[in-house]
Structure formats: C-alpha cells, structure tokens
C-alpha cells in the first residue's frame, strides 16, 4: 500500500526565488491494492503534481510518502530501482514518454537492461509478446514501429504493457484517456478494470467526474491543492457535502438527459422515468428529472433559479478560496459518515 501523510509541495517563484507557490497542501490519503482511486480536480489543482511526487519525479516539500512502510524520499540506487519495479506511471501525452529517434518497442529493452539482464533474448521476446497481448495489442502490429506510426491509444497500452513486465503494484494513470478516441477509451478503461482485478492499485488522475465515478472505488476531490472531500465514490457522488463538489457534480452532463434550445425550450427525454429506471423498466423521463431548471414554469422563473443557483455556488466557492488564501493551515477533514470525509471549514454544507 502507498500512503501519503500531510504531503505539501511548494514551488519557488520570482526572479530570485523569493516567493513560493503552494501546489499541494497537506494531502493525506492511501492507494490500496485492488482499488481504483480517482483524483479529481480542475486544471491547476495539483493532481499531476501529486502523481509526480509519488513517482519521485519532483521532490516533496514536507510530509511523507511511504510505500510498504518505507519513506520513498530515502530511497537511492538499488532501492530506488526496486521501487520503480513496483510503482509505475502512464501520462496524458504518451508521445512524451518515447524518444522519436527509436522504435516504440525500445521501451522494453530498457526494462530488460535494468531488471532482467540475465534473461535470454528469445525468452524476453516471449514475455514482451505476452504482455502486449494482455493489453489487447497484436505484437506483429506494433513491434519495430516508430511512434509516429502508432496511435495514442496504442502507445498508452505499450506503456502499460511495459509496466506489467515488472512486479507492479501501483499505477499512476495521469489523464491517460483524454487524448484518445471514445472507442479506445473504453478499451483502456476495461484494461484498468482487469488490472484492478489482479490486485493492482490505481491512482486515476482526471478532471472528468463521469469517468471517475465510472471506474473508481474511492474518490478524492482537490481544490487549489487541498483535499476538500474524499471517500467511497458512491458516497461522494450520491451525498456531496462540500460546495465545490456540489458545483462540479451539477456541471456534469448526463448521458440520459438531453438539452435542447434555451432554458425556456420544452425538453423531452428518451428512456425511463426515475421510478421506472429504478425498477429497470423502459419508459420516459419526466421534465423535472432532466435538469433542475426544466420543471419550473416560465422563462423568467427558470432564469431566476439559474441565477440563484450560480450565486449559491459562487458564494460557496468564494468561502473556500478565501479560507485557503487566508489560512496557512490545511482545513481538517471530518468523517461525516463511514469512509466519507469533508473539509467542513472551507464551505461544506
């Protein structure tokens, strides 16, 4: 298990480094075997910085990250190499992980050189082929190809196949499906689900709440580098307590809901009423189930409600941001129910 305890990262700013910019403040959570943990937040909220600290690509300013009881900041030489045998990362832009001068499958050669120097070439080839097949790739299709000859989805899966050649226990997946097409996204998500079933712990970094809800057992919500809500995914999504979480969830498009025209337009839905949906029966959605504004009478009423809702969220967000700007200490997380924590002092309901 990988544990973050009060982890903070502050970058130096200014011409002579006289200022500091806190990217992550007091983050504490676990990545457990056989679970997907979704790390959700807007761009600039500190998600990727947390991933890079876990992978030792950027140092921790304060706090500790421990893997199987050992502080990873103390690892050097062979110990650090052994850490990377168990903890790997795949990033948003797969092309950045390859040298375009070489063929894409050269990433496997570096693994062999570092971890399996005594394995014969024939045996290593069999291992690589098996790993590629396990992520849905035909070795013949990708072997000896340069990066520009492969798709983003293929390159992502090659990186995952490389990780699987090691005794991997933790995978940091940083926005890994944001640059690939919809059908390939499904393949990668199914692959992550299979890895989870094999006991792998995954940190799924994303700004997409729908994907986080779809794939994860646990969810962490970040705002300005601070964990404002976290816990079991179903509890965070079904019973959001922090204003920021509520605002994010309200903005998430629903696949079974359709918006047509202005707020005043009549909207008809395909599917089932909420009652029929709960019973698993086909039917229709009522207008009020489509959108919180659609069931109201009159355009003025809907617009007034829209303005009121926006003001409510803006006020809550202002409370959160004001607290984070004016307080050096990290707002405490309070357990409001089993495995559901919220930073109450920054705008929780």
Where are these regions (language model features)?
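The feature captures the beta-strand-to-loop junction immediately N-terminal to the Walker
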Residues: 40-42
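Conserved ABC transporter NBD signature motif
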Residues: 63-71
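Conserved ABC ATPase signature
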Residues: 146-150, 154
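Short catalytic/signature loops enriched in Gly
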Residues: 233-349
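ABC ATPase "signature
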Residues: 227-231
């Amino acid at each position: 298990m990988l544990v973050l305890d009060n982890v903070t990262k502050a970058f130096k700013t200014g011409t002579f480094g006289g200022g500091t910019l806190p990217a992550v403040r007091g983050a504490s959570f676990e990545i457990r075997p056989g679970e997907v943990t979704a790390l959700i937040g807007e761009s600039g909220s500190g998600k990727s910085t947390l991933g890079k600290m876990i992978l030792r690509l950027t140092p921790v300013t304060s706090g500790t990250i421990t893997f199987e009881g050992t502080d990873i900041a103390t690892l050097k030489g062979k110990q650090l190499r052994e850490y990377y045998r168990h903890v790997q990362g795949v990033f948003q832009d797969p092309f950045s992980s390859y040298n375009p001068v070489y063929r894409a499958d050269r990433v496997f050669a570096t693994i062999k050189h570092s971890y399996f120097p005594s394995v014969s070439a024939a045996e290593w080839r069999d291992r690589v082929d098996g790993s590629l097949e396990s992520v849905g790739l035909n070795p013949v299709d990708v072997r000896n190809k340069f990066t520009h000859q492969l798709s983003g989805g293929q390159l992502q899966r090659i990186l995952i196949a490389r990780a699987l050649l090691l005794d991997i226990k933790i995978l940091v997946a940083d926005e890994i499906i944001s640059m690939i097409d919809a059908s390939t996204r499904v393949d990668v998500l199914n692959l992550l689900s299979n890895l989870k079933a094999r006991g792998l712990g995954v940190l799924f970094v994303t700004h997409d709440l729908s994907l986080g809800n779809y794939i994860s057992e646990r969810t962490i919500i970040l705002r300005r580098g601070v964990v404002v809500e976290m816990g079991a995914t179903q509890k965070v999504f079904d019973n959001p307590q922090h204003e920021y979480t509520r605002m994010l969830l309200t903005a998430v498009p629903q696949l079974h809901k359709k918006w047509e025209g202005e707020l005043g337009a009549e909207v008809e839905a395909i599917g089932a009423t909420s009652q029929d949906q709960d019973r698993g029966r086909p039917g229709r959605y009522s207008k009020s189930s489509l959108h919180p504004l659609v069931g109201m009478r009159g355009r003025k009423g809907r617009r007034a409600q829209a303005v009121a809702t926006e003001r409510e969220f803006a006020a809550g967000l202002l409370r959160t941001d004001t607290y984070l700007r004016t307080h050096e200490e990290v707002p405490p997380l309070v357990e409001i129910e089993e495995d559901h924590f919220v930073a109450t002092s920054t705008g929780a309901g």
